C-alpha cells in the first residue's frame, strides 16, 4: 500500500512540474510576442509632428515636424520663407554625440508606387557663424528612415551640395562646391530607383546620389531649413513643384 501511495505521489509531482513548465513557456512566449509587437509598432512608419493643412504651389502639406507649419510662410507667388531657430538640425549620429532631431520639416504624403519628382530653387541664409546652415529637400518614411538633400555651408565656410541618408543612423556625404547663392535641387523616382540632383539653371542637372527605391508604398516628401550651430536662419524655396513623373535619364537627370 505504501508503495502505491509513493508511486501516486511521484506521478502527481511529475504532472505538477510539467504543468508549471508549460505555464512558464507560455508566459515566456506571451512576453516575447508582446515585446515583438511593441518593437514592430515602434518601427512602423511613425512620423513625429502634428497634422497640418497647408497648400503651396499645388503641394498639399499635411504633416508638420517640429513646428514647421508656424515657421514656413508663402507669398502670392509661392515663394516660401522658412525659419529655423538656434541649433536646429536633423541628424542621427553613428556615435550619438551629434544626434539632433529638432529641425522643422514640412511634409506631404505621396504614393511611392507611382513615379514622382520634387524640385525647388533653394536659397539658404549663409553667415559667418552659420556652420551647416542649409535649405533641404526630404524623403521621409519615419524618424529613423529618411534622406535629405541639402544646399549647405561646410566647415571651411564653403557652400556645397550635401546628402544624408539615414537607416537607423545617418551617413554624411559632401558633394560639389557651389559659388552661386541659389541652386535648383531635385529628387526623382521611377518607383525602382531614386536619384538626387542639383542645377544652376534647371536645365543641366548634376547627379549627386542614386540608389534603389526600397521605401514602402506610402512615403513623405518635403522641405526644411536647418541651423545646427548659429542663432537662427532663413531659407527660401521658389519654383517648388511635385509631379507624378520621373526623369527619363537617371545619369543626366533629364
Where are the model-predicted features located?
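Bacterial N-terminal signal peptides that target proteins for export
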Residues: 1-8
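Hydrophobic helical h-region of N-terminal Sec-dependent signal peptides
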Residues: 10-13
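C-terminal motif of bacterial Sec signal peptides marking the signal peptidase cleavage site
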Residues: 16-19
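Bacterial signal peptide processing site
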Residues: 21-23
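Extracellular glycan-recognition regions
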Residues: 25-254
Amino acid at each position: 500500500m505504501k508503495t502505491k501511495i509513493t508511486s501516486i505521489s511521484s506521478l502527481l509531482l511529475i504532472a505538477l512540474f510539467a504543468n508549471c513548465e508549460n505555464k512558464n513557456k507560455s508566459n515566456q512566449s506571451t512576453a516575447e510576442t508582446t515585446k515583438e509587437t511593441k518593437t514592430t509598432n515602434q518601427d512602423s512608419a511613425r512620423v513625429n509632428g502634428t497634422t497640418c493643412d497647408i497648400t503651396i504651389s499645388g503641394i498639399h502639406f499635411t504633416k508638420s515636424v517640429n513646428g514647421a507649419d508656424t515657421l514656413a510662410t508663402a507669398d502670392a507667388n509661392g515663394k516660401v520663407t522658412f525659419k529655423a531657430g538656434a541649433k536646429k538640425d536633423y541628424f542621427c549620429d553613428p556615435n550619438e554625440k551629434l544626434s539632433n532631431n529638432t529641425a522643422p520639416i514640412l511634409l506631404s504624403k505621396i504614393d511611392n508606387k507611382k513615379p514622382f519628382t520634387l524640385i525647388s530653387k533653394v536659397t539658404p541664409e549663409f553667415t559667418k557663424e552659420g556652420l551647416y546652415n542649409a535649405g533641404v529637400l526630404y524623403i521621409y518614411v519615419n524618424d529613423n528612415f529618411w534622406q535629405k538633400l541639402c544646399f549647405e555651408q561646410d566647415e571651411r565656410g564653403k557652400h556645397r551640395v550635401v546628402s544624408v541618408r539615414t537607416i537607423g543612423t545617418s551617413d554624411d556625404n559632401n558633394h560639389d562646391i557651389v559659388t552661386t547663392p541659389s541652386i535648383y535641387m531635385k529628387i526623382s523616382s521611377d518607383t525602382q530607383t531614386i536619384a538626387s540632383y542639383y542645377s544652376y539653371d534647371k536645365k543641366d542637372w548634376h547627379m549627386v546620389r542614386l540608389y534603389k527605391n526600397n521605401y514602402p508604398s506610402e512615403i513623405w516628401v518635403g522641405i526644411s531649413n536647418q541651423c545646427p550651430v548659429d542663432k537662427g536662419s532663413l531659407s527660401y524655396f521658389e519654383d517648388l513643384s511635385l509631379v507624378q513623373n520621373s526623369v527619363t535619364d537617371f545619369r543626366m537627370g533629364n
